[in-house]
Each structure stands twice: as C-alpha cells, then as structure tokens.
Amino acid sequence: MIAVIFEAWPAPGKGEDYMEMAAQLRPHLEKMDGFISVERFRSLIDSDKLLSLSFWRDEAALEAWRNVEMHRSVQAQGRRGVFRDYRLRVAAVLRDYGMFNRDEAPSDSRAAHPVGSDDLLGARL
C-alpha cells in the first residue's frame, strides 16, 4: 500500500479554489483502479495549511492517477497561483492494523495488547 501526504498552503484568498478543484477531481479519483481512500484536513497549528492523505494499492495505481489528463491540468492550475507552496510525500505503508484487527501488528505489540483483553472489552462498551 502507498500513502500520499500532500501538504498545501493556498495563496491568500485561494483556499476555496483548492477545495473546488479537489471536488472536481473526486469522481475521477474514485474510478481509478487501485485507489483506496482520500481525506482532507486543516492544521490546528497553522490554519493556512491543508493536508490531503490518500492511499493506493501500489505504485502502478498511483502512476496511472498521476498521468490522468484532468489531474495534470489541475496540478498546473495549482502551480499557476492557487498554491503559495506545497509539499508532497509518497511512502510505502509498512504495517496496517488497528485496535481490533491486529494481524499486521508487531509481535511485541500483539502480546502487549491482545484482542479480547480486558482493556479492549472496556473500550468497546
């Protein structure tokens, strides 16, 4: 699984433009083979900073998205004035687990917090 972390600082008065561009891309994104999910957030520390976090099955799926013409067009719009700055990080997900699905948790973590332990039962109530 691949994670894409896109931090963006819209130019003054351009925050809504970014959100509109993201909304235009969403239907195309959801049709992409290998797309898993995307969410957007605003920083609590820097109110000008937005973050888009997306997950992809593999690098090939991400490469296909990167080369969709509409996506390239929106990227160019962003670079021409919607963004004051941005930073993109692409990372391989090493493990993917949660409170109840512990299959990929490290063995020491599974031993310390087994599914069905008293602390988890209380949390579910």
Describe each model-derived feature in a short phrase.
Residues 1-50, 59-67, 83-125:
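Short S/T/G/P-rich N-terminal loop/turn motif that feeds into the first structured element of a domain
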Residues 76-78, 84:
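Short arginine-rich
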